Amino acid sequence: RFPSDAINQDYEYAPVRGATAFTVTGVAIYGPEDGPGGDAVAHELGLYEEDRQPIDLGICGGHSGPGGQYHYHYDANCMHWHADTSSTNYMFEDVASSVHSPILGFAFDGYAIYGSYGWDTNFEVKEMKSSYQLVDGATGYGGISDYIYVAGLGDLDQCNGHITSTPHSVEPVYHYHSTIHNGVNAHGFPYFPLCYHAIPDSRNIGLMGGTGGGGAAPIGRSTNSGNRRRGF
């Protein structure tokens, strides 16, 4: 269930665990944390050793959780493969970098999630990069709390989105991107949206094992603000 018209507001709460969005093919998109609470992608990249529970992401950036439901933690290009060549190795280096990425799915607030390539304000295609980086000495073992948002580090805001034109709207519109890298070319935490830009449909919260509220306060922003952002 996706709102037909996303309602703009200050950033909204999102589930700590479970589905935060769905792909256009109906597969759940989860936040960056795995069951034990670490960054599943950082573990896959070898940044830390997971000693709490066996975790492994397949070639497409996903795996099965409790109950056997397959879900994605990052965009490994399987859902939108469009290479510059005839290659089918699903390597990011071979993704067509001269065209805007397609829509991968929709967050529960109704906004679209595009792949990693988008338009800047001059309609030039570029890789959209996140604005998060690891806190000094952190590895991702602590999940979301190991990261800090640095405004201007990359192209995207705290929720991993921005306002520009897209192939579906010449008028600039808010949308999310999947991210492979951050602004200094390290791994692209949070990989998919980290919070909601608009009011999500509450009927979606709790699907596929989500726990609803109780998420962390927004990274890099004071919790004393009157309008708080909250991560998955």
Model-derived regions, located:
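Solvent-exposed N-terminal domain segments of exported/luminal and surface proteins
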Residues: R1-D51
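A short, polar beta-strand/turn micro-motif
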Residues: R1-R17, Y74-G118, G188, P193-I199
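Extracellular structured ligand-interaction cores
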Residues: R17-A19, L57, G67-H71, D75, ...
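Extracellular/lumenal glycan-associated surfaces
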Residues: T23-A28, P66-M79, S169-H187
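Short linear interaction motifs
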Residues: Y48-I59, V150-Q158
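Aromatic- and glycine-enriched beta-alpha-beta binding-site module
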Residues: E50-S87
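Extended, compositionally biased non-globular segments
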Residues: V99, F106-T211, A217
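Disordered, low-complexity segments in secreted/periplasmic proteins that are enriched in proline
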Residues: M208-F232
